[in-house]
Design a protein with these regions (language model features):
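Residue-level recognition of hydrophobic positions within alpha-helical transmembrane segments
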Residues: 8-10, 22, 302
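Cleavable N-terminal signal peptides of Sec/SRP-targeted secreted and luminal proteins
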Residues: 2-17
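Extracellular juxtamembrane-to-transmembrane boundary of type I single-pass membrane glycoproteins
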Residues: 288-303
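Hydrophobic alpha-helical membrane-embedded or membrane-associated segments
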Residues: 8, 305-310
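Cytoplasmic C-terminal tails of single-pass
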Residues: 324-328
């Protein structure tokens, strides 16, 4: 299935989602980023967004999730399963330190993916489709790496196997789902009149008034990971009574856990949006400079040839005039 056809389906399905850290969170990150793109950067990435999406970067932000979902992409989801491990990394339980040589073997983790696709996006040896996919993956993975549990513990698979109850609901859930969906759902319902656009405007204002976004480096992927790991150990895995969560017991989380963590979600969405914009703007500049570098030697040669022709022509005219004067 082509990207254009798949995204025509997904974009029109997107209105069915009410809330969710998945599609809504990624959409917000992309939307925040696009609001800060340089004109030239926006024009460049628009070349890779299917025409029916009208340049909407947020509409492609969940593509890497959709292509490995058999319900959304039933015909060839299995062709993309190789990309699953690129969405996250895991560290030893309560080790609280990411070590790439231990936790990202052969670059098969989210840090390796961020490095790879930022390079492929501006690699002249990659064709249009490869660069388009690189953009889609990059937009998504910048969002993923700012979700703390995408840098969670190996023993419970990033919170998937930590089971319990959230806000006294009768059906059990897992910690990953609490972070993917539940906290953001309640946050938007309570504080933004169930309106995602109001939430976006709030995040946008937050983004321009946060000290922690000053002097950001556009591709400090290790720093982004270290931040998520720190939040996992200091905040995400602690229940309402600051007792560690694990797979040995069911959790019961409520108001205290919610109030402690919704500001962190706001912060991570804002950081992801800002950093994605910085990354794309810088890659656009790097791409522009790369376009001229391979032609520089040729340009110098041509310039030298033209200069030599000019010198010989001027010399020829001078000699002709001098000979003509001698004859007279």
């Amino acid at each position: 299935m082509s990207i254009s056809i798949l995204y025509f389906i997904l974009f029109n399905q997107e209105i069915l989602y009410v809330f969710g850290w998945g599609p809504i969170g990624h959409s917000l990150v992309a939307r925040l980023a696009q609001s800060q793109l340089d004109f030239s950067t926006n024009s460049w990435i628009n070349n890779y967004i299917p025409l029916n999406l009208s340049g909407n970067l947020s509409a492609i932000a969940s593509w890497p999730d959709e292509i490995i979902d058999p319900n959304k992409n039933p015909f060839d989801y299995n062709k993309w399963l190789w990309s699953h491990e690129l969405h996250f990394l895991t560290i030893p339980d309560w080790n609280c330190k990411y070590i790439s040589r231990r936790d990202c073997l052969n670059n098969r983790c989210i840090e390796g993916a961020l490095k790879n696709y930022s390079e492929r996006l501006i690699d002249n040896n990659c064709d249009y489709i490869q660069q388009q996919q690189a953009l889609f993956f990059l937009v998504h993975f910048v969002g993923d790496v700012h979700q703390p549990l995408h840098c969670g513990f190996k023993g419970d698979f990033g919170g998937h196997n930590v089971i319990g109850f959230f806000f006294n609901k009768t059906n059990s859930t897992n910690l990953r789902y609490v972070w993917n969906v539940e906290i953001m759902n309640i946050h938007i319902n309570r504080h933004f009149q169930s309106d995602v656009n109001l939430y976006y405007e709030y995040l946008k204002s937050l983004m321009f008034n946060q000290y922690f976004l000053i002097n950001e480096t556009y591709n400090d992927y290790k720093k982004w990971i270290d931040e998520s790991v720190s939040y996992v150990c200091k905040q995400v895995y602690l229940d309402d009574n600051n007792i560690k969560l694990d797979i040995s017991r069911n959790f019961v989380l409520g108001e205290q856990y919610f109030n402690r963590n919704w500001p962190l979600i706001d912060q991570r969405l804002v950081q992801a949006g800002r950093r994605l914009a910085l990354l794309l703007n810088q890659l656009s500049k790097n791409r522009s400079s790369k376009k001229f570098l391979p032609d520089t030697p040729l340009f110098i040669i041509i310039l030298c040839i033209e200069l030599a022709i000019g010198i010989f022509a001027a010399l020829g005219v001078h000699l002709y005039k001098r000979n003509k004067q001698h004859r007279i």
